[in-house]
Regions:
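Alpha-helical transmembrane segments
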Residues: 1-172
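Acidic, Ser/Thr-rich low-complexity segments on the non-lumenal side of membrane proteins
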Residues: 99-100, 173-195
């Protein structure tokens, strides 16, 4: 989905509810598999926190969902009611392209994973690793979202700086990007022809 939706011009895919539920099941299996590693077969270092690791990998989706659902409940709405308060909507509101939004969120998530990795490498306990991941998860979703929304309302310098950065995320599809776009579109059209 990522390659076609971000890079393809004619090969966009809509996964819908069934697709997102399927991805949720895949992520659940991933987390369950990681957490149920048979310690008798695989020797893991003492301070390797599997729960902090999986939470770091899924940090933005998990904490953004918690933030959005908490806000909906606080407003007296169903936690499942639709709105445009997810983190990716914030980037789009600032003027980021879809690829810029995607790469920004991936970058934020990678930052959390790297912080977990350094905490693990420095020999910090599993509890401290978990505290670091949870603190960063709250920071990159709850605090970051609230801060940027406030800057948008005030039309502050930070807001205009973020808008200037957003303009640079709209790239022309030439050179390497053109090659990737053609490949994504070609691969999907070959699959359709083979059906």
């Amino acid at each position: 989905f990522f390659l076609h939706n971000v890079f393809g011009k004619h090969s966009k895919m809509f996964i819908g509810d069934a697709g997102t539920l399927s991805l949720g099941i895949i992520f659940s299996v991933f987390v369950t598999t990681i957490l149920s590693t048979n310690l008798g077969v695989v020797k893991l270092p003492n301070n390797l926190g599997l729960i902090p690791f999986t939470l770091a990998v899924l940090c933005v989706p998990v904490f953004d969902t918690l933030r959005v659902m908490s806000a909906r409940i606080a407003r007296g709405k169903s936690p499942f009611s639709p709105d445009k308060t997810h983190l990716h909507h914030l980037f789009i509101e600032l003027g980021y392209s879809h690829i810029g939004t995607t790469l920004s969120i991936i970058g934020i998530n990678l930052f959390v994973v790297l912080c977990w990795f350094f905490a693990y490498k420095w020999g910090l306990s599993i509890d401290i690793q978990l505290y670091i991941v949870v603190t960063l998860g709250v920071f990159v979703t709850f605090i970051f979202y609230t801060f940027v929304k406030k800057q948008i309302r005030k039309e502050s310098r930070v807001y205009y700086s973020l808008c200037r950065i957003a303009k640079h995320t709209h790239i022309e599809r030439k050179g390497f990007w053109s090659f990737v776009q053609e490949w994504a579109d070609k691969s999907i059209s070959e699959e359709i022809r083979n059906i």
